[in-house]
Structure formats: C-alpha cells, structure tokens
Amino acid sequence: MLRFLNRCSRGRGAWLLLAFTALALELTALYFQHVMLLKPCVLCIYQRSALWGVFAAGIVGAIAPSSLLRYPAIALWIYSSYEGIRLAWKHTDILLNPSPFTTCDFFVSFPSWLPLDKWLPAIFNATGDCSERQWSFLSMEMPQWLLGIFAAYLLIAVLVLIAQPFRSKRRDLFSR
C-alpha cells in the first residue's frame, strides 16, 4: 500500500483529485450560503480557509509531483487538515455543549496582509452564530461532517508522507 501511495504522490492525477475534492466542498459551502441562505459563522469561515489550504496543497502538488515540490505540498496538506480538525472540533464542541462562556468571535480576524473578508466578502464574511444549529444530515451537524472529512484528509496525508521513502519495485521480467 505504501508503494502505491508513493506512486500516486508522484503523479499529477492524485494531486488534482485532492484539489477537486476540496473545491467541491467549497462550492457546496457556497451553495449552502447563497442558495439555501444558511449564514456562515466565524468558525465556518475558518474551516473554509482550511479547505482552501487543502485545495492549494493539491494545486502545488500537481505542478511538479515528481520533484521535491511535493514535500511542501504534503506539509501544507497536513497543516491545513490539522487546523481543519482543530476548528471543526471546537465548533462541534460549541454546538453539542452550549455554554454562555464558550462562544466564537463576532468578526473574522484574518492577518492584515491577507484580509480575505475584505477582498472576497461573498465567500469569507461571517454573518451567523456558531452555536446556532442550521443544517443536519443523518443526525450530524455540518461541523461534525467536516471533522470526519478533515480526519480523512489528515490520515491520507500522513500515509502519503510515510510512503515517500518506499519506491516502487522495478519489475524486470527477463532478469535472474
């Protein structure tokens, strides 16, 4: 399995599949926001940012998958997945254990050098409350689904990182 993951990480298709899945989740979030009129909260916006990090990792990895550029892509993939898990866990905790002392911020706080909420307010502007239950599917809220998705991303990313030293075997049918 590790040799297979190594081979996949050296091909462009797997990286583009990673980027496609993250983009599909982003488009789903925008559908929920603009078509179903669900209001995203601050933690939802941060989780979207983590998904954009996974998307960026897929694009960086697809640029030159056979070179050493895949290592920064794997690092970005692991970091974004970990942050997504951390944020989804915090959001799930706020939803499942409501408390007046555990709340999220009122406004998104991006770095001053990257004010995404000012540049793209249709995507990164938070208008909802983190403790409000807006959507559920199969008795799970959206942050719980994202917790599972980010955990799957992280598991696969760690396995791909572990697989990097395992080269695929050369198959020489006519040698001894």
From Swiss-Prot:
GO CC terms in record: plasma membrane
Residue intervals on the Cytoplasmic side: 1-14, 66-71, 164-176
A Pfam family it matches: DsbB
Signal peptide (residue range): none
Compartments where found: Cell inner membrane
Origin: domain of life: Bacteria
MF (Gene Ontology): electron transfer activity; protein-disulfide reductase activity
Residue intervals annotated with topology Periplasmic: 32-49, 90-144
Keywords of the record: Cell inner membrane, Cell membrane, Chaperone, Disulfide bond, Electron transport, Membrane, Oxidoreductase, Redox-active center, Transmembrane, Transmembrane helix, Transport
Disulfide bonds: 41-44, 104-130
Similarity comment: family membership: Belongs to the DsbB family.
PANTHER family: DISULFIDE BOND FORMATION PROTEIN B
Protein role: Required for disulfide bond formation in some periplasmic proteins. Acts by oxidizing the DsbA protein.
HAMAP family tied to this protein: DsbB
Descriptive protein name: Disulfide bond formation protein B
Protein source organism: Pectobacterium atrosepticum (strain SCRI 1043 / ATCC BAA-672) (Erwinia carotovora subsp. atroseptica)
Gene this protein is translated from: dsbB
